[in-house]
């Protein structure tokens, strides 16, 4: 049995590229209980907490848990609270390079592997009108950093250095290699 410990539709779609048959079992944890640390450590800790929470219920299953966050100049960006919060995030990221981190936790045959994948993303310089036009698409609400690279958010991006799918939410090639080990 293979379990994805995430309810993210993007992670589910990406995992299908690597695993044919899996179940979705979101972890029931309070993410706010995880102290803010360095971005890579933060996402790794959250992925571990999610994976371990599901492993208690399914100790013999293969379980994949992941968490993604955006970091810019030492600040972690999660999902925006509202449109104004999303506007501020995008304004701050405009013309800048930020980092997207995904922590991965995989339990297979009772053994645990953990990895953190980092991708650098550079935004174009965005006008107020461009930001407002993007926000009008209403795809920002459930996305860290207030954008989705796989949707209209692609128009905001000048350059990606690293794994594109990491920015979507699941670094597929890294997951495939972890599963081979």
Swiss-Prot record:
Pfam families in UniProt: Maf
Essential cofactor(s): a divalent metal cation
Listed GO biological process terms: nucleotide metabolic process
Top-level taxon of the source organism: Bacteria
Site features described as Important for substrate specificity, chain residue numbers: 10, 68, 150
Catalytic activity: dTTP + H2O = dTMP + diphosphate + H(+); UTP + H2O = UMP + diphosphate + H(+)
EC number(s) reported in the record: 3.6.1.9
GO cellular component: cytoplasm
InterPro entries: ITPase-like_fam, Maf-like
Active-site residues from the entry: 67
UniProt-listed Gene3D superfamilies: 3.90.950.10
PANTHER family, per database record: BIFUNCTIONAL DTTP/UTP PYROPHOSPHATASE/METHYLTRANSFERASE PROTEIN-RELATED, BIFUNCTIONAL DTTP_UTP PYROPHOSPHATASE_METHYLTRANSFERASE PROTEIN-RELATED
Chain's role: Nucleoside triphosphate pyrophosphatase that hydrolyzes dTTP and UTP. May have a dual role in cell division arrest and in preventing the incorporation of modified nucleotides into cellular nucleic acids.
Protein name, per record: dTTP/UTP pyrophosphatase
Upper taxonomic lineage: Bacteria, Bacillati, Bacillota, Bacilli, Lactobacillales
């Amino acid at each position: 049995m293979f379990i994805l410990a995430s309810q993210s539709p993007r992670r589910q779609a990406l995992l299908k590229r690597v695993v044919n048959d899996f179940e979705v079992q979101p972890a029931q944890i309070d993410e706010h209980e995880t102290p803010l640390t360095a971005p890579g450590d933060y996402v790794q800790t959250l992925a571990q907490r999610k994976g371990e929470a599901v492993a208690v219920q399914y100790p013999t299953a293969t379980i994949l848990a992941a968490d993604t966050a955006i970091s810019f100049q030492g600040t972690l960006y999660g999902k925006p609270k509202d449109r104004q919060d999303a506007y501020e995030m995008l304004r701050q990221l405009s013309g800048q390079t930020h980092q997207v981190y995904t922590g991965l936790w995989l339990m297979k045959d009772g053994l645990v592997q953990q990895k953190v994948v980092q991708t650098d993303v550079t935004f174009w310089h965005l006008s107020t009108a461009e930001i407002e036009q993007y926000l009008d698409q209403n795809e920002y609400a459930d996305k860290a950093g207030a954008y989705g690279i796989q949707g209209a958010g692609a128009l905001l991006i000048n350059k990606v250095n690293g794994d594109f799918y990491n920015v979507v939410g699941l670094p597929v090639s890294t997951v495939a290699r972890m599963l081979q080990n």
